[in-house]
From Swiss-Prot:
It comes from the Bacteria. PROSITE patterns: RIBOSOMAL_L20. Belongs to the bacterial ribosomal protein bL20 family. One of its GO terms (molecular function) is structural constituent of ribosome. One of its GO terms (cellular component) is ribosome. InterPro entries: Ribosomal_bL20, RIBOSOMAL_L20_CS, Ribosomal_protein_bL20_C. It comes from Mesoplasma florum (strain ATCC 33453 / NBRC 100688 / NCTC 11704 / L1). The gene is rplT. This is Large ribosomal subunit protein bL20. Binds directly to 23S ribosomal RNA and is necessary for the in vitro assembly process of the 50S ribosomal subunit. It is not involved in the protein synthesizing functions of that subunit. Keywords: Ribonucleoprotein, Ribosomal protein, RNA-binding, rRNA-binding. Pfam families: Ribosomal_L20. One of its GO terms (biological process) is translation.
């Protein structure tokens, strides 16, 4: 009787790794060993990327807010300090969206920030 090198359980497990490597270049999408190595590496990059995405978006919002308050003679840090003094608790994402889509409402926040800074 011939020796069974791997059965259906092993085949299914290997097939799962190959399926995850769909679309990869070269032997990385067909060879089990290469596919497994690449998928593990890809998952590590994806994990890191999910953390970086949060940083990148925060940076983007800060740049947008800074660009929006400069015409009013304020810097980003002074503007945020003024909002804090005025007890206005709006997150950076919303401030960025307001600056782009609704400049007149954003101007009201800038005025409130200025007022809080001058009355300090």
């Amino acid at each position: 009787m011939a020796r069974v090198k791997f059965g259906k359980v092993t085949r299914a497990r290997r097939k799962r790794w190959i399926k995850r490597a769909k679309g990869y270049y070269g032997t990385k999408h067909s060879s089990y060993k290469k596919a497994h190595e690449q998928v593990v590496r890809s998952m590590a990059y994806a994990f890191i990327g999910r953390k970086q995405k949060k940083r990148d978006f925060r940076k983007l919002w800060i740049v947008r807010i800074n660009a929006a308050v400069r015409p009013y003679g304020l810097s980003y840090s002074k503007f945020m300090n003024g909002l804090k003094l005025a007890n206005i608790d709006v997150n950076r994402k919303m401030l960025s969206e307001l600056a782009i889509s609704n400049p007149e409402q954003f101007k009201l926040l800038v005025d409130a920030s200025n007022k809080a800074l001058t009355s300090k």
